[in-house]
Amino acid sequence: MNGFTNKDFETFNINGLDERMEAIQTRIQPKFQQIGESLAEDLSKKTNNELYLHIAKHARRTVNPPNDTWLAIADNKRGYKKHPHFQVGVFDDHVFIWLALIYELPNKSKIASAYINHFDEVKNLPTSYVVSLDHTKKDAISLTDLNKSHLERFRDVKKAEFLIGKHIEKGDPILANGDELYQFIMDVFEQLLPLYQLAIDSRDE
């Protein structure tokens, strides 16, 4: 299993859409394929449900190169954006590991309501966890700063999102060790499985 190197992070300093996309495809996507296939297999076993690997294509982009790239694991073979999904991705200064609920979710309000009703479970995750309210931005808040109003916004505002998990900063030694990194990612996803399952159950009600 291969980890991530400084060269992978430097991909996002390359100017030009075609040039950056070529670097993403040659440097990062082979690692996503390797990590993602194992994640899909391991998470399928843990959820007792078939999960599928998706790798971001950035196909809608015509001018601006992407600032980050990611893999997604979801229970739908055709796509992931309309479903609760797991994400591993790279910005220029960190790797993110998310349970992701983004604005395309058709049952967003149901899932948000379930999370509000189980708010204590959300807050019981380790304090090292972070939350993003917009997947396009680097910013994340500490789980300790999360309150119900964030989830109410996620419920009520069409474009609002909720992603929860961990960041690993560029330069952290674990990134270079693929096997250790994989175990770290799996540990995060295992801790997030109850919230994933709650989202799936709420979606399917």
Curated annotation (Swiss-Prot):
Q: Which InterPro entries match?
A: UPF0637, UPF0637_domain_sf
Can you tell me which residues the record assigns to a coiled coil? none
Q: Which HAMAP family match?
A: UPF0637
Which family does the record claim for this protein?
Belongs to the UPF0637 family.
Query: What is the name of this protein?
Result: UPF0637 protein OB1420
Organism of origin: Oceanobacillus iheyensis (strain DSM 14371 / CIP 107618 / JCM 11309 / KCTC 3954 / HTE831)
